[in-house]
Amino acid sequence: ALGKSGKEPVLVLRDIKTENYLGGSLAIARHLSDFCKEVSVLSFLGEKDTHKSFIERNIEENICLNFLTKSNSPTILKRRFVDNVDKKKILGVYSINDDLITNEEEDLFIESFDRLSKEHDLVIISDYGHGLITPRVAKHISKSEIFISLNAQINAANIGTHSIRKYED
């Protein structure tokens, strides 16, 4: 951080270094790929700014990507500004549309989930509260016959609005 601007009451930052990495469900898949023979990912990319080529270049060979398209959305991109001295996050800027997916997108997700879950021993659901897992999708997942491991996260974009309660026993 450089400090406060002399002209306006705003924080001024300087980008010294840039790092790009795969986060969210792709980070989980990459960790799992170290000790699992095969890992599948089912998620959404935005119809705008997909970043698909970056993802494909940086994903392990034993990870099978199954992407659906979320309409009127970018692929989620989180920029974080980190202080160069103490490595603490100063600011985050998210490119995101966390509106719920459409009914048609729900249908595609459920169809893909049913197909893929039959091919695997374990399903890990990472619900970041960004509109991809609707109450209808959560109810469908909850009724699955396969063992489900669930991670419902609270983050800066969903505090107070996201809960694990939408999943049934």
Regions found by a protein language model. Name each.
Residues A1-L2, K7, D15-D169:
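Ribokinase/PfkB-type carbohydrate-kinase core domain
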